Amino acid sequence: MIRKMSKNVVVIGTQWGDEGKGKIVDWLAESVQGVVRFQGGHNAGHTLWINGKKTILRLIPSGIMHDGVTCFIGNGVVLSPEALLREIEELEAAGLDVRSRLQVSEICTLILPYHVAVDKAREARKGEGKIGTTGRGIGPAYEDKVARRALRVQDLFNPALFDEKLAEVLDYHNFVLTQYLGAEPVSANEVRDQAMALAPALAPMVRDVSSNLFALQQEGKNLLFEGAQGALLDVDHGTYPFVTSSNCVAGAASAGAGVGPQALQYVLGITKAYTTRVGSGPFPTELVDEIGTRLATIGKEFGSVTGRPRRCGWFDGAALKRSVRLNGISGLCITKLDVLDGLETIQLGVGYRVNGEFRDVLPYGAHAVAQAQAVLEELPGWTESTVGITEYSKLPVNARRYLERVAEVCGVPIDLVSTGPDRNETIVLRHPFKG
């Protein structure tokens, strides 16, 4: 059999999440037959604006908005059945066909009520020292996976095995809850009854996702792998311990979807024209003045899932350089360029001073990053609006110069520029699937 040629693209956030991946995945989905989520859980919200209507997706890939596109939730995702089914119902109420176009890996780790209880109790106990989790049980579920005590989607359809595994894992978590965290225990019967009640609705969507993705590749179908969070929140390469609990880098698409690394041919890095961060953790280019407030206000910088305000700062090119290296980024997509409209001057981070020495790439670990002082370069701003522009040549001259300097500092070309929330408000310099 001669294998047909397909092209597969990985979309990755290059900062601390919230870069605008959802819109770009939705836009790129016109060129694919499958969209795959490969890590994270329902802690990450992807916001889409379609013809002026706002849609927030937490678990379901953004390709669901396109007829004829099959969406996959890969094994690297930690899955709350309750959250998934609620999201499906919301989309169906809006008139979308979801269940016939969604496949869920049978080996996804389940998020169950005791994970949420542990997550919330830990954050409450830490007080001011908390990481800033969403309290949705993501971290504790990944802990169970690594400790080899997790319940998985396939266990929902073997009640005897489910009960056996639940008794073991709940014995551990209830000990932690009551003896260490000072919280109430979780009832095994309640966990079981809830899970078994949800299982029949989930069953028709449960598949061997890895095999089905392989089959699509053999047929020459294009695939899009949709990352959640951002590379600087990666559990290994991010500002540890102020990170998420999964690997957010492009390489995680292979393990988290069950495809070979040779299937990942192009990596698109999504980055804002400035920088934001939610929750705790070091942030070298953060602005705590009126400009930071202005960026947050104009950029509507509030979390799509939690509603938490985002911290804002100048674009950090040295942090992006780390992301470019980690992900093997082929090209960048710059989002929210319009938020910088009207600024007289714009600062761009090109490196750091660490113990008196210049560093041109983000150090590893939160302690080292906290010691780093951003080295900023000043560029002229622009007064003209960039909103809705779809041709690069029509951008203000200084906006083009800013983008060119960003590409130079990061060492990778800019292939796309998003000039508004709607999928059509996009400048294409090189199309990831067609270029």
From Swiss-Prot:
Any one GO molecular-function label of the UniProt entry: GTP binding
Residues annotated to bind IMP: D18, E19, G20, K21, N43, A44, G45, H46, T134, R148, Q229, T244, R308
A biological-process GO annotation: IMP metabolic process
Residues the entry annotates as binding GTP: 17-23, 45-47, 310, 336-338, 418-420
Subcellular location(s) per record: Cytoplasm
Record's catalysed reaction(s): IMP + L-aspartate + GTP = N(6)-(1,2-dicarboxyethyl)-AMP + GDP + phosphate + 2 H(+)
Cofactors required: Mg(2+)
Chief location: cytoplasm
Record EC number: 6.3.4.4
PROSITE patterns from the UniProt entry: ADENYLOSUCCIN_SYN_1 (PS01266), ADENYLOSUCCIN_SYN_2 (PS00513)
Comment on bound cofactor: Binds 1 Mg(2+) ion per subunit.
Subunit structure: Homodimer.
Protein name listed in UniProt: Adenylosuccinate synthetase
